[in-house]
Amino acid sequence: MVEPLLSGIVLGLIVVTLSGLFYAAYKQYKRPNELGG
């Protein structure tokens, strides 16, 4: 039986990681030359 705390931490990390990736991709799409790249 999976502990609720462990599963919560894993889900939290996944959500934060996906959110960070989408946010970075969105920034690069909106402003491709903002960071010189």
UniProtKB/Swiss-Prot annotation:
GO BP: any one term: photosynthesis
A GO-annotated cellular component: cytochrome b6f complex
Record's subcellular location: Cellular thylakoid membrane
This protein's record includes keyword S-adenosyl-L-methionine: no
Molecular function in Gene Ontology: electron transporter, transferring electrons within cytochrome b6/f complex of photosystem II activity
Transmembrane intervals: 5-25
Membrane topology annotation: Single-pass membrane protein
The keyword Repeat appears for this protein: no
This protein's UniProt keywords: Electron transport, Membrane, Photosynthesis, Thylakoid, Transmembrane, Transmembrane helix, Transport
Family affiliation: Belongs to the PetG family.
Description of how the protein assembles with itself and partners: The 4 large subunits of the cytochrome b6-f complex are cytochrome b6, subunit IV (17 kDa polypeptide, PetD), cytochrome f and the Rieske protein, while the 4 small subunits are PetG, PetL, PetM and PetN. The complex functions as a dimer.
Function: Component of the cytochrome b6-f complex, which mediates electron transfer between photosystem II (PSII) and photosystem I (PSI), cyclic electron flow around PSI, and state transitions. PetG is required for either the stability or assembly of the cytochrome b6-f complex.
Protein name: Cytochrome b6-f complex subunit 5
